[in-house]
Swiss-Prot record:
The active site is at residues 29, 98. GO terms for molecular function: carboxylic ester hydrolase activity. The keyword Iron does not apply. InterPro entries: AB_hydrolase_1, AB_hydrolase_fold, AB_hydrolase_sf, Hydrolase_4. This is Putative esterase/lipase 2. Its EC number is 3.1.-.-. It is an enzyme of class 3 (hydrolase). Keywords: Hydrolase, Serine esterase. Belongs to the lipase/esterase LIP3/BchO family.
Length: 268
């Protein structure tokens, strides 16, 4: 069993390694979530026999921790970097959601030669945390003509999201430290995250956003990230919010396939 420190990295790890491939993927989950949030995408990766690793960050899922030193964004970055180096991984493609997207960008800043490409899903950035309470409540509870079909079809998912929110609230003492650290990192002028986004440069990067995201503002994020690199490919999925990989897994995967096909043609 792996633990969350510099010697043995994670308390929980899930790996799919069918055979040696040129690329290896690492999934990085978001704040208050866990790697199971990618489960619908895992099944599509398995069908392609693409190798991947994923794990729960300290304080998330079954990786319990109340150590405030471990509940910091930079600690998560160190853990991922150490994991990649210790496993001697190359041609790594990081797939990071929300907070995990920020971790991915920061990892690329530290060990850029190990990272082949970035797939950022509603990534935390300097436009994040402009959350409107009314929009959150409307997303969960308000039904109207424009969203009726989506509301009915995703009733179980809505309940699941509420469950996650309730569980996060129950663990608010644990997440208080991490949340404060995230907000600090996402502030305009935070040199570390700002430089990390600027260092994307020519690195092949796909950004997938939900049109109805209440956490990572879609248009503001596109404007912000496009200013950091003109090589970023943006895909916006209509009718979904902060977790497009879970709400629209097939379309999400199609975008990933298209991105990887282009990557192959460009011989990165």
């Amino acid at each position: 069993m792996l633990t969350s420190n510099k010697n043995t990295l994670f308390n929980s790890i899930f790996a799919f390694k069918p055979k040696k491939r040129k690329n290896v993927f690492i999934f990085l989950h978001g704040f208050g979530s866990e790697y199971a949030s990618f489960s619908r995408i895992f099944s599509l990766f398995k069908k392609k026999k693409w190798p991947f690793f994923t794990f729960n960050f300290p304080g998330h899922g079954d990786n319990e921790s109340t150590d405030t030193d471990q509940l910091k964004l930079n600690h998560f970055v160190d853990l991922v970097c150490d994991f990649i180096v210790q496993k001697k991984l190359n041609n790594v493609i990081l797939i990071g959601h929300s907070m995990g997207g920020a971790v991915a960008v920061l990892v690329n800043k530290v060990i850029p030669l190990k990272i082949k490409a970035l797939i950022l899903v509603a990534p935390m950035n300097q436009t994040s945390f402009s959350v409107n309470k009314k929009r959150i409540l409307d997303t969960f509870f308000k039904r109207n003509n424009s969203n009726h079909k989506d509301f009915v079809e995703h009733e179980e998912k809505r309940k699941s999201l509420l469950k996650i929110a309730i569980n996060a609230f129950k663990k608010r003492t644990t997440f208080k430290t991490l949340y404060s650290d995230m907000v600090q990192n996402a502030k305009y002028g935070n040199d570390s995250l700002e430089r990390a986004y600027e260092m994307i440069g020519n690195k092949p990067t796909l950004v997938i956003l939900g049109a109805n995201d209440i956490v990572t503002p879609t248009k503001a994020s596109v404007d912000y990230l496009a200013n950091k690199s003109d090589k970023i490919i943006f895909k916006v999925i209509d009718g979904v919010g902060h977790s497009p990989h879970d709400s629209a897994p097939k379309l999400f995967f199609d975008y990933v396939l298209e991105f990887l096909d282009n990557l192959k043609k460009q011989r990165y």
